Amino acid sequence: MYKMKRNTLFVRQSCVSSSRIGTQLPLNKSKIYTSSSINITNYKQDQKLYTRHYYTNGKIFENKKVDQYLKVTEEMVFSFMNGFTDGCICGTIIILCLINT
């Protein structure tokens, strides 16, 4: 089982700064489990504004690359995050992928 963790910090106006994680994975993995959480906190008032968790389970076929699946997951979370503007002060997104052999 492989574990990949991505922690993305974003600030006011939903400016996204992310770093891609490169890893060597065989293409014949059967399933991928994705767990992602979003936490938005106003640190000036020490108040948690929003928390949400996503859990998905999908199959990966031999002709489908893992990087493509992670890119789709990343775009889904970032498009949701871009809906926040002034209300988004500071927060983190953690995406944990477990690839089952």
Swiss-Prot record:
It is a single-pass membrane protein. GO terms for cellular component: membrane. It is found in: Membrane. The chain crosses the membrane at residues 77-99. Keywords: Membrane, Transmembrane, Transmembrane helix. Its main location: membrane. This is Uncharacterized protein R900. It comes from Acanthamoeba polyphaga mimivirus. The lineage of its organism: Viruses, Varidnaviria, Bamfordvirae, Nucleocytoviricota, Megaviricetes.
